Curated annotation (Swiss-Prot):
Recorded name of the encoding gene: mael
Lineage: Eukaryota, Metazoa, Ecdysozoa, Arthropoda, Hexapoda
Protein's job: Involved both in the piRNA and miRNA metabolic processes. As a component of the meiotic nuage, plays a central role during oogenesis by repressing transposable elements and preventing their mobilization, which is essential for the germline integrity. Repression of transposable elements is mediated via the piRNA metabolic process, which mediates the repression of transposable elements during meiosis by forming complexes composed of piRNAs and Piwi proteins and governs the repression of transposons.
Subcellular location(s) per record: Cytoplasm; Nucleus
Predominant location: cytoplasm
Residue ranges flagged as DNA-binding region: 2-69
Gene3D superfamilies: High mobility group box domain
Protein name per its UniProtKB record: Protein maelstrom
Family: Belongs to the maelstrom family.
Region Disordered, annotated ranges: 415-440
GO cellular component terms, semicolon-separated: cytoplasm; nucleus; P granule; perinuclear region of cytoplasm
Amino acid sequence: MAPKKHSGFMMFVNEWRNHNAEGRRMTLAQAVSHCGTIWEKMTTQQRGPYNSGAKDADVADRGKRERLNCYGQGIAQVDLAHKEAAESLMHMKRTTERLVINAKKSYDLENAKFVFATFNYFTKALTTDVYVPAEFAACEYSLKEGVRSIYSTMIDPGQIIFGQGSDALHHSSTTHDLPLPPNALGEKNMAKLYRNIVCYLTKCQGADKPLIVFTPTENIAMVNSCFRYLECEDDSGDGGRKIQVFDIQYLLFILKKAVMDVAGLNDEKINKFVTDAFFKKDFFEFTSGIACQYHEDNDRTKYCTQSMVTRWAYTFSDFMCGDLAITVQPGKHIPAETKPNYRIICSDASSLAHESSFESFYSCPGSRVKKETQSEDFSLSSSQISVASRSYTPTDHTSFTTDLTKVCEFPSLGMRKSSKHTGPSVSTQRERNAGAWNLPAHSRSIQKYSDNDFSVTDSVRKLKN
């Protein structure tokens, strides 16, 4: 709706009320009624200053009015939001680089500690970035020691956003499968939970250092919102230590570059796209025994926050421990149990037997397939399949039995010299067709027939005779 324009008459009413004690005691409606008779008796010259003042006020308001974009948003507000986002991203990158560089300069890169954290949520508000948390997990990690400690808990917010029960049920059933409030599991006191999280992060990173957690790029907004949801319930004054949420994928990139530099390896082919692709492959996605008991029992380990932070730690170890010659420990750097579910089948060709395509890297020591011992590791079933494949002789089941190499078998197309050739005899053709599965053998010799042989009257005469 367009704003209302200023009126010369209302400018006169406001001036009269400001300069007359009687007008200050009147209401606006009474002043308008009183000044109406005076305005009618005024000449055009007397009304001129008030009308020009109204136009000047319209111009001033138009200059103060904020410009909007095509979505109805203020351009200045949108630019400010973009500027704040760019500054926040730059702060995140500089802080992450500073953490890695300081550890590298102190020759203690393998002992640098990082905390990975993430949330599960029930639902998200439609118009704002408010998330209702459902589960939280954090993991303290270093390259040398692997997973140092894990903090995991379920959250019972007590209620969800009004009118979003269906969305919450759909999101829960397709992901973490946690029961909705009021039947939710876990901690109900949000202030107590937030203090416990702050206490755990302080224990991991020190009382004099900022509280920094790392999570994937697409989860940063959600994790920040869930921390604000818990913090708003805390009135004890511990909220002064703000938890900062940084990008774990950028940490992987910077840490990989630093590790390769320390190891003296060429890092020209390492960029953000390579490290992001490696992180998103999630090689340990189906690892069992690293999720909470609830998700283990309900077969939702992929969406468990405890499983997520543990898999991220395993990914870091798998990607960088080999560069620093760090011995990986089961349960710390890699899963406690590694069960390869592949089977190697020997090929017929000797060249393929020596050039196996199953040779790839596995995190568990001793699980690499070696070419020199490849022939000894074949199972009984694979050997039987290999022997059966070598004894198999293919059979041609086509009906065409003519020799394709003979020029005489094909008709002349005009450019080829014609050659006299007589067709094969009946006995020869019968022998050729005998090997074809879809052509029956003739029960009698082929001979020429006339039209009388198929006549009804001639057939009757033959029967009578």
